[in-house]
Regions:
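Basic, flexible linker segments flanking DNA-binding modules
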Residues: 23-118, 214, 270-277
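Short, amphipathic alpha-helical "recognition" segments used to contact nucleic acids or chromatin
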Residues: 1-8, 46-51
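RNase H-like two-metal-ion nuclease catalytic core shared by retroviral integrases
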Residues: 99-101, 185-187, 193-194, 207-229, ...
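Mobile genetic element proteins and their domesticated derivatives, centered on retroelements
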Residues: 14-15, 25, 45, 61, ...
């Protein structure tokens, strides 16, 4: 305000009316003229935020900045995002496939031990559903607990057995022999089916199942589905179920190959998996 009025009044009069010391006025004037030292960092933060469609919070943006050779404390990134008004978007009814004991129930071999030192030692699988436009779409997926990477998936309009067996077939194609693998699921009817269990037996895969009604026994894939829905389903508008399906396929590719994870040292799951396999 003082700067605007200086053309009409002397600085001494303006400072006297404002009861502002001359030294304080010049200090603030100097600060205003200073270049914003975070200008380029802000531009990168905005770019990263929009490249990832608002899915990255300050911690993941901090990691991606490091990948771009920009080193800022995560609290600084958080503060800059607040100033820029960049807010990471927050996290549907879970699909229930349990229909009682319609086949053989496997023991809970995983027992909530989600850690593994190598790929292809512990996989988890589940089915989730999406209800849009009066229609339902089902996603069946397998994750490897080593890197949380998406090993295989199928998308279907009905929760049929082939949705799960086709997914398993695709996963088995990339599985080395003698892997000593555990594949964990809930007690859904598909996983109790003789055909599914025979496929596991023929490949030497140990079957593991959660206890009845205990979603925490399969928490990693439950969390994956939560991330998927919060970053895709709740963030975008879709024109049709076919449009949603296209975006779902694109998101699954994004999750595996471009979405970085802090616990993977800032790498996407598929890249982390490949590095581990190459080092073995």
């Amino acid at each position: 305000m003082i700067q605007k009025l200086r053309k009409e009044f002397s600085l001494a009069i303006l400072l006297d009316v404002a009861q502002l010391p001359r030294a304080t006025f010049y200090y603030h004037l100097k600060q205003l003229k200073k270049a914003d030292k975070y200008h380029s960092a802000k531009e990168e933060i905005i770019a990263i935020f929009h490249e990832n469609k608002g899915r990255y919070g300050y911690r993941r943006i901090t990691a991606e900045l490091r990948n771009r050779n920009i080193y800022l404390n995560h609290k600084t990134v958080q503060r800059l995002m607040q100033k820029l008004g960049l807010v990471c978007r927050a996290r549907m009814k879970k699909y229930r496939s349990y229909k009682g004991e319609v086949g053989k129930i496997a023991p809970n071999l995983l027992n909530r031990d989600f850690h593994t030192e190598k790929p292809n030692k512990k996989w988890v699988t589940d089915v989730t559903e999406f209800k849009l436009f009066g229609e339902t779409l089902y996603l069946s997926a397998i994750l490897d607990l080593h890197s949380s990477d998406l090993v295989s998936y199928t998308i279907s309009e009905r929760p049929v057995l082939s949705m799960v067996t086709t997914m398993l077939d695709k996963a088995i194609e990339i599985l080395p022999n003698n892997s000593d693998l555990i594949l964990h699921s809930d007690q859904g009817w598909q996983y109790q089916h003789r055909r599914y269990q025979r496929m596991l037996w023929e490949k030497g895969i140990q079957q593991s199942m959660s206890r009845k009604g205990n979603c925490l026994d399969n928490a990693v894939i439950e969390n994956f589905f939560g991330i998927l829905k919060s970053e895709l389903l709740y963030l975008q508008e879709f024109q049709s179920m076919e449009h949603f399906k296209q975006e779902l396929v694109a998101y699954l590719d994004y999750y595996n190959n471009r979405r970085i994870k802090a616990k993977l040292k800032g790498l996407p799951p598929a890249i982390h998996r490949q590095q581990a396999l190459s080092a073995a």
